[in-house]
Amino acid sequence: MASARVPQQLFLQGVAAVYLFAFASLYTQIPGLYGPEGILPARRTLRPQGKGRWQQLWETPTILWEAPRLGLDTAQGLDLLTLLGTVLALGALLLNSLRHPFIYLLLWAAYLSACQVGQVFLYFQWDSLLLETGFLAILVAPLRRPSKHKIPQGGLAGALPHEDLPFWLVRWLLFRLMFASGVVKLTSRCPAWWGLTALTYHYETQCLPTPAAWFAHHLPVWLHRLSVVATFLIEIAVPPLFFAPIRRLRLSAFYAQALLQILIIITGNYNFFNLLTLVLTTALLDDRHLSAEPELRCHKKMPTSWPKTLLTSLSLMLELTVYGLLAYGTIYYFGLEVDWQQQIVLSKTTFTFHQFSQWLKMVTLPTVWLGTASLAWELLIALWRWIQVQGWSRKFFAGIQLSVLGTATVFLFLISLVPYSYVEPGTHGRLWTGAHRLFSSVEHLQLANSYGLFRRMTGLGGRPEVVLEGSHDGHHWTEIEFMYKPGNVSRPPPFLIPHQPRLDWQMWFAALGPHTHSPWFTSLVLRLLQGKEPVIRLIQNQVANYPFREQPPTYLRAQRYKYWFSKPGDQSRWWHRQWVEEFFPSVSLGDPTLETLLQQFGLKDKSPPRARSSKNALAQTLNWVRAQLSPLEPSILLWGLLGAVVAIRVVRTLLTPRPLQSSKQTREEKRKQAPKKDSRAVSEQTAPNSNSNGSWAPRRKK
C-alpha cells in the first residue's frame, strides 16, 4: 500500500482554499442578505425559546448565539465569523503549522454556524458538501507535524498507524457524491437524460453560464449525446474503481473525474463546488504519483522473482479486463456505432427504466459491502502498522490515536450509509436500524448528507428568467439589470468562479415556478421599494449603475421571459428572448397586495431591532472593514485573494534554499553501488576538499 502523505497535504490545502473562497464570498453578501435591512434578516432565525443555553446550542448549533455578549447583532456576528474564517483559511493555506485539527474544527464550526442562519440562500448541496468535507479535514489533519529530517517511505514503514483511516473516508465521500449524482439522473425519469439530449439544453439553461458555454452549446448534437454517455460512464461505472486494489485503475478513475470537473468549471459558474470535488479526488492519489523524487516516481529496473512477475502479469490482465468491460458495457447499453458516411458516432439508450431499477437494486447493497470490505482492509493495515511500532510508550500513544480515529471512522461510515441508501429505497429499508438511530442523532450537524446534482434538466423549452422593472409613474418602466445573471441580451456571460452570487442563484430557481414558491422574492421587492442600499449592492455593487440610485422606484413589477443563446450568425448578441407572462404584479409601498404577501410569508418585523451601542469598538472595527471592502466587486476580491496566495507561495519558494539532504543521499547511494577499486583510488575519490568549507565533491580523474 503506497503512502499518501503528499495527497493528504494537498487535500488539507485544498479544503483551506475552498473555505477561503466560501467565507470571503459570503462576507461580501451579508448586509444585503442577512443585515437588518436585508432580504432575510438573520436575527429572525435566532430568537430564544426559553430553553437552556446548551440545549439551545445543540438544537441550533451556531456560535452566533454568543454575538450579543460581544455587543453585536446577529448580522455583525456573522460578519465577524466570516472574517475570522477567511483569515484562518488563508493561514492554513499558507502555513504548515496552521494545518492542525483545531484550526479545521474552528473553520467547520464557523461555516456550520453561518449555515444555521443562512436560510434559503445557504441551502445548496455544495454547502452541505463543504461541511462534510470540512469535518473530515479535522480528522485528516495531523496533531503533530512530521519531522522534516524523516523522508516518507512507501509501504508500511513511513506511515503512522492511524493516518490513512480518515483519508479513506474522503474517498468514500467522493464515491457517494459521484455515484449518486449519476444514478439520480436516471431514477428521476427525466426525458432529456434518458434521451441523451440533456447537454443540448444544459449549457444555455444552467444558472450562470460562462462565455465558453455559448460555444459548447453550438457543438454538434451527436457530440452532445456522446458527452452524456461519457457523463454516465464517469459518474456511475467509474466510481467503484476508487476502491480497486490495482493502483493504475485508481489513477485512471482520478483522471476521469478530474476531466469532468475541469470541463464543468470551463462552461459553468458553479462557485467552489467543482473545486471542492477536485480536492476530494486527491484521495485517489499517492506519494509515488506526486513525488518529485525519481526513486519514488518509478521503480528501479532490478531482477524480480517469478511470483512477483506473475502477480504483475495478473494485475495487468485484470486491469485490461476492467477497461474492456467498461468499453463493452458502454457500447452495448448506449448503442454506440460509427456512421462512417456522416462521420459521426450514433448513440441511444438501449435499456428501460425497469431494467435500470432492477440493476440498481442489485448493485446498491453490494456497493455498501464494497465500502465495508475496503474499510476493513484499511483497519487491518492500521492494526499491522501499530504492531510494528517500537517502544512501549510510542505504542501506547499510537494505540490511543488508532482507537479514537478508528472509532470515528467507523461511526462516520455507518451514518453515511443512511443518506447514501436514499438512491434505492429498498436498500434504505434493509439497513441496520442502529445506523438509522445514529444518523438521526447527529443529522442536524450535517456530518453525512445525501447528494444528487442535476437530477432533472430544466428549461427544455427555453431558459426561464425573471426580469425586475421599476417605474416612478406606473407607465414608463425601466429594467433593473443584475451584475451576473442574464438580462441584457448583448452582455456576455461572466466568469465568476469561485464566487457565488447567492441572490442571482435564487433568482434562477424562482423563475422555475410562481413567485409564491419563493417567499423571499416579496422581501426583495419591499427592500428595493424602500431603496435599501445593502440590497441594491447585491444587484449592482457599483450603485452608480443602478437605474434608481437617486430615488427608489415608486412601483415595481417582474416579468418572466424565455432566453436562448443567440445563433453564430448574430452579431453583438449573446442571447435572444421572448416575453412569457407577468411574474409579480405591480406594487408600491403600502399596496394591499404587497402587505398581504408580507404578512402571509411572515416577512413583516413584529418589532424593530434593538439598537446596539455605537461605542462598541468591535462593531466599529467591523463597520470600518466593511467600508473598505464594499466598493470591490466580489469576484475581483476573491481573485485578488487567490492572486495574493499564489504570489506569496511563489516568492517563498524562490527564497527558500533547496535542501541538500536528498542530493547527498542520492550521491551516497551511487557511491555505495559503484564497483570497488583499490583503496588508494577510493580514498582519493572520497577525500573531502579542505578548501570547500565542509562541502565535498569527487575529484576528476586525470
Swiss-Prot record:
Chief location category: endoplasmic reticulum
TM region(s), chain numbering: 10-30, 75-95, 102-122, 123-143, 164-184, 226-246, 259-279, 316-336, 363-383, 396-416, 628-648
InterPro entries, alphabetized: LMF
Q: Which PANTHER family match?
A: LIPASE MATURATION FACTOR (PTHR14463), LIPASE MATURATION FACTOR 2 (PTHR14463:SF5)
What function does this protein fulfil?
Answer: Involved in the maturation of specific proteins in the endoplasmic reticulum. May be required for maturation and transport of active lipoprotein lipase (LPL) through the secretory pathway.
* Localization (cell): Endoplasmic reticulum membrane
The protein, known as: Lipase maturation factor 2
Query: Keyword set for this entry?
Result: Endoplasmic reticulum, Glycoprotein, Membrane, Transmembrane, Transmembrane helix
Q: What does the record list as GO biological process?
A: protein maturation
Record family assignment:
Belongs to the lipase maturation factor family.
Topology in the lipid bilayer is annotated as: Multi-pass membrane protein
Q: Gene name?
A: Lmf2
Q: Where is this region: Disordered?
A: 660-702
What residue spans carry the Polar residues bias annotation? 682-695
Where is composition skewed (Basic and acidic residues) in this entry? 665-681
Q: Which organism is it from?
A: Rattus norvegicus
Q: Which Pfam families match?
A: LMF1 (PF06762), LMF1_C (PF25179)
A single GO cellular-component term on record: endoplasmic reticulum membrane
Glycosylation positions in this chain:
488
